[in-house]
Amino acid sequence: MYKTKLIPVMNEDAVIVQQTDSIQDPKVTPDDTVVDSSGDVHEAIDDDVEASSPMELDSAVTNDARVLESERSEKDGVVGSEEEDEIKSEDVLIDKDDESSEVKEEEEEEDGSDDQSSELGSEADEKELDLGLKEEKKGVSDYKSLLSEFDDYVASEKMGSGVSRALSYGFEVGDLVWGKVKSHPWWPGHIFNEAFASPSVRRMRRIDHVLVAFFGDSSYGWFDPAELIPFEPNLEEKSQQTVSKHFVRAVEEAKDEASRRSALGLTCKCRNPYNFRPSNVEDYFAVDVPDYELQAVYSVDQIKNSRDKFLPAETISFVKQLALAPQECDPDSLKFMKKKAVVFAFRKSVFEEFDETYAQAFGTKSPRSSVSTLEPHNRAPPRAPLSGPLVIAETLGDLKSSKKPTKVKVSKKKDKYLLKRRDEAGDKSVQFGEIEASSEASHIQGIDGSLDGDFGLQRRAPTLQTPMKDEKSGIVSMDFASSNTAIPGKEFSASKPSLDEEKGLAEKSKERMEERAAVLPEHGKSEAMASLKPKEEAGTDLGSAGSSLQPLLESHTSASEGKSSTGSVIKKVKVAKRSSSEMSSENPPSEPKKKKKKKKEPDSDHPVKRKNLYSGEAGAKKLSQLGSAHLQTYMEADVPQLLSHLQDLSLDPFHGLSVASFGTARKFFLRFRSLNYQKSLSVSSSDATVENARDTKPSKPVKTVKRTEDPSKAGKKRLSSDRQDEIPSAKKLKKTNQLKSMASEKKIIREAKDSIKPIREPSRVVQAKPARGQTGKKTAPSVKVVEPTMLVMKFPPGTSLPSAALLKARFGRFGLLDQSAIRVFWKSSTCRVVFLYKADAQTAFRYATGNNTLFGNVNVKYFLRDVDAPKAEPREPENTKEDDEPQSQWLDQAPPLHQPTLPPPNVNLKSCLKKPVDDPSSSSNNGNGNRAAVRVKFMLGGEENSSKANTEPPQVTMTLNRNSGPSSSSSSVPMEFVSKKFQNVVHHQQLPPSTLPPILPLPPQYTKPQQLPIKPVDHVEPPMPPSRNFRGPIPAVSAGDISHQMLNLLSKCNEVVANVTGLLGYVPYHPL
């Protein structure tokens, strides 16, 4: 027999009623549901359903199929049990009475033959009814199989292994989590229900993985629950990973979701029945939480948990606390945001939703009219959760913090740099450091620490100190990585050998130390000094002092412990350096004394410097002055904390700004360093190389340079002269630091000179050329002789020239510059920079000639020229500099034309600025003096002075002697007394040598007006061969007194100088 089966179809009202019953809404009851005697739910098919489109039917059937899924499963179970009972009963009946059953079967066969016609009629009626139902529900039967398969898939997925695995790790569907995506930081997201995902997303499913939807970019991925971490406990750490706008937006969305879930517990259907709308998945609702995005999908369990988390007492306490201290709350914290969301949601649910009085009072539009509360189905989600790209989870061996991930790389580079600089001290220092680091690592295996500090601490430790320092003196101890043990929170990544291996390595290292100290004392000490110098000159004075302090402080505790043989080796040397009595009782400290005596023999040229070095006994006596009680006080204070401050400072230079007790630690280590290191600073090897390059005679010893530095800084030990060639790389690496120190010293000198003299010295005798050899023998920067030297740069024609500011930036680091003398000559493609000290100019010249890319890929030629004229004129230094460069270049190439006879330099000239016309006769005697006594050149008027120089020399200081003849060499011609205009004229004319002596007055037709404009002063002829110059006539000046012209010249100078200011960064000139 065939039974008629009606397929149940529910309308929207029925679905809403059934789903909202779980949210406790007894007001609405189903209208169209009919329950028959067997418990099956049947519903009438409305006319609207018949007229509906296939898509609407599909949605209706889908809702119906999902709602009745649980009912079907229950029915299947009941039917199955009933069938089993029937089978059992039939078996019993057959066993009891087989004969009666056979009789019944015969009777049924007879009855069947009689009623066969009636059964055929009933079957025809059933077929007709089935055909009618199929015609009424067009297309529904086509979807039945697909919907059933989909329901089965969803049911299996919901109870899949991924969800069960997530539950084992404490996660549930919908929880907020952090997931690590490849090539991205930890990203916020939430565990997404797979039933809402599209088929394309579900196809990518992995076994035992859960679907995570991320915030921000709506990306998604399949993650192992073991690789996820909770959101709220890790928010403070993970939110600081990066400042990318996408990441910040994702974190904000995650915080907003957490706040919305807090407000979800106080959201109800009292005012708006459409706040909770059923979704396509069972037990999930689309909820509209006020003040948040619409259509947030939550499960029934999430809604109940949110309601259970609401604590009225806690909410009232929060409101009271906020009222008492509104500024003490952190508005950006997640806890505050969640509590605020609860308070606002409570207010929305209890008080009037739309405040009409506010709109009336301020004349604004009523919020009630602007919000449509009865149209929930027209709302669309602002963004699909899985609309972004699929991301791949990063496989994590163990959960590590990715905060500031680039710090590890920086530490690696820094450690490689330090190891490279300190390996020249010898292989044994690195070997001992590795042994010590491995032995120390075995004692701190249980300490957890951040990965950021591992590399810096592990690899820097072997090179902080070397064992040769212990052999050199009894003060500095052998300690490589022991400072790491005093700092908790750090761990080593180095290999950890067994205890027997450590003992064997320690014994070998001890034997090698003794052999090295006994057989090669000189070599060991030299290497110790070489290893000490890069450490101190690398800018790690505090670090070196702290690391050497570590064994001193630990000697009190390690003396009684002696856990390993390595510790005993360190203990022996540490104890030796603490007092003179202990030093005299043991053998290893006695060896440094012998080495000190031997060290003085090869360096007999430096007896004074060697006296300043500490011997072992003297250092111990100096250290013993602290007293054991004094040291014990420091150790009892908190020695590990002091060492922790020191090591944090080495990793972060600004560590002391945020630590209150850092001042105490700094005083402690400075005090220790001042008691254990020499105070007299000897020049380093890089200083010696620079000074030797500055024409220093190699036979003379390098004198001690008294630097104006902090007296509390550690001393620098000078290498012996026979060992300087073994550390060439250290010299190169310290080049930058040396240049910086030179610049700072010269700045101090300049400030001191400016405070002594308000105006540049008007009368100062410039030293002659023989003084050049003395620049390398300067004993202190304060006694350096000002010897202006200019660096001339000749660029190829047609290339762009650097500006004055660029020249100042390129060469300012080499020393003090005369900024007013920097010139850029565009016509001749020449630039000029004047250094106040010749040594600085030589350093800059060597650097420029060795660097081909200083001004780009341009072939620049560099020349050094002496500027022997005094800088007494504060009014016209630029004229002085302009005359020097082309004159020196031309005089080296052209035959002498106006070289005077050089009288003895026994006249100290007076400044013509103070008395320009009072004593013209006194200046006439100096016009032809030698270049050592020449002092002034004023050529702003140009040709009027130069022309008179040829006719009436006894009247002017810048004129030539009539009786002067050509000198033997052009190199002795002074550049100071030749004017620019006269030089240019001679430069153009190029008369043959036979016409040079003597110089006679020129005919009057060659005479030119006396006054010339001032502009040509800034354009000096370039230092090029005479053949390229234009040949012009030589101007002449009529004989007579030049006092009037001199007054005009001085007045014009005053007018020019009066308008000069310091707006462009130059020092303003002082008026006359």
Curated annotation (Swiss-Prot):
Residues 173-234 form the PWWP domain. Gene3D superfamilies: 2.30.30.140. A motif (Nuclear localization signal 1) lies at residues 402-409. Residues 897-906 have a biased composition (Pro residues). Residues 366-375, 545-568, 947-966 have a biased composition (Polar residues). Coiled coil: none annotated. Residues 96-128 have a biased composition (Acidic residues). It is found in: Nucleus. Residues 21-133, 365-387, 486-619, 681-738, 871-931, 944-973 are annotated as: Disordered. A motif (Nuclear localization signal 2) lies at residues 596-603. A motif (Nuclear localization signal 4) lies at residues 733-740. GO terms for cellular component: ESC/E(Z) complex. A motif (Nuclear localization signal 3) lies at residues 705-712. SMART domains: PWWP (SM00293). Keywords: Flowering, Nucleus, Transcription, Transcription regulation. Its main location: nucleus. Residues 66-77, 498-526, 706-729, 871-880 have a biased composition (Basic and acidic residues). Together with PDP2, PDP3 and PDP6, interacts with MSI4/FVE and MSI5 to suppress FLC, MAF4 and MAF5 expression by regulating the function of the PRC2 complex and modulating H3K27me3 level, thereby promoting flowering. Interacts with MSI4/FVE. Component of the PRC2 (polycomb repressive complex 2) complex which regulates histone methylation on histone H3K27. This is PWWP domain-containing protein 1.
